[in-house]
Design a protein with these regions (language model features):
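Acidic, serine/threonine-rich low-complexity disordered tracts
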Residues: 125-131, 137-147, 178-251
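Short, acidic, Ser/Thr-enriched surface-loop or helix-capping motifs
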Residues: 171-172, 216
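Structured extracytoplasmic
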Residues: 10-11, 15-163, 189-190, 237, ...
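Outer-membrane beta-barrel pore domains and translocons
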Residues: 50-52, 154-156, 169, 183-185, ...
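Mid-length scaffold segments of soluble, non-membrane domains
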Residues: 161-171, 177
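Interdomain boundary/hinge segments at the C-termini of tandem beta-sandwich modules
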Residues: 6-8
């Protein structure tokens, strides 16, 4: 008589992920919920700002500041009345006269206004602008223990101005934007990046990328962190080799006061055409 012993054994099959949701529809629903999910009051944010300039791997400029950022409610998504004030500033590393090219950031501290993609609908999240892009689902992921839709996007048309590609992270339950990663299409990037340059200098853009994150606090979602990175190469006519530069600007929100009626006076606001590196000694 033959006796056979059988031992139970569980064998987990590979997971099959099926995306039944329409990514464009999810983005549109999240846009419609912005007035509900984000602040409906005027807030005053405190932020730490830093901008750095690298020539190759060497830092040639580092400047820092403490900022006040006055933001109106997200209900109308209008940034015209949002302002930035530099409270304190310092230059940790100055560019030298021996550097053949001075690289400076125009309007840098205004990151908290212009690159708040959820508030500034002109940046990406506008229903008409969405028509310029195609969207597709990526694998979901957790951020702060909350499940997120991850939606890729890229241009589907060619326009006179540069478009973007990247990822949108949207909270599955609340349909709030929690993280936005974007890069500029390099085909028409020079106009978007370059403010002015010396005669005879050839400018070759390599990268313009953005990272914006938001944080949920007591049922509302608030701006948390912004980073802007620009990489480019420059060479002079009749020169054999080019030089690479990396310019990074970032702001992290360190404090927030809700329902603040005070606005930043125009004379104290940092304007979009000012250069923080040149003005840092005034603070």
């Amino acid at each position: 008589m033959l006796t056979v012993w059988l031992t139970p054994h569980s064998n987990l099959l590979n997971e099959v992920v099926v995306f039944a949701e329409n990514p464009r529809m999810i983005v549109e629903k999240a846009i419609n919920k912005i007035p509900l999910n984000y602040s409906d009051k005027r807030d005053m944010l405190t932020g730490f700002y830093r901008e750095t300039v690298q020539k190759g791997r060497r830092y040639i400029g580092i400047s820092e500041a403490v900022l006040d950022v006055s933001k109106t409610a997200y209900t109308n998504r209008n940034i015209n009345y949002d302002k930035v004030r530099v409270e304190k500033g310092r230059r940790l590393l100055s560019q030298k006269a021996s550097d053949t090219l001075a690289v400076k950031v125009v309007g840098g501290p205004n990151l908290g206004v212009t690159l708040d993609v959820v508030k500034n609908k002109g940046a990406l999240l506008d229903f008409e602008e969405l028509n310029n892009y195609e969207f597709w689902m990526a694998e979901s992921m957790l951020i702060d223990n909350r499940m997120q839709y991850v939606i890729n996007f890229r241009p589907k048309v060619i326009l006179m101005y540069a478009l973007l590609y990247g990822k949108l992270y949207i909270d599955r339950e609340r349909l709030s934007f929690t993280r936005i990663e974007m890069s500029l299409d390099m085909q028409n990037a020079t106009t978007a990046i370059l403010y002015k340059k010396p005669l005879g200098l050839r400018f070759k853009p390599q990268e313009l990328s953005y990272l914006v994150t938001y944080k949920d606090v007591d049922g509302k979602t608030y701006l948390n962190y912004i980073r802007n990175t620009i990489r480019f190469k420059c060479d002079w006519k009749r020169k054999l080799f080019s030089t690479s530069y990396t310019v990074a600007s970032e702001m992290v929100v360190t404090d927030r006061k809700e329902g603040v009626l005070e606005n930043i006076p125009n004379k104290e606001a940092f304007s979009l055409n000012q250069i923080f590196y040149d003005k840092v000694d005034e603070y």
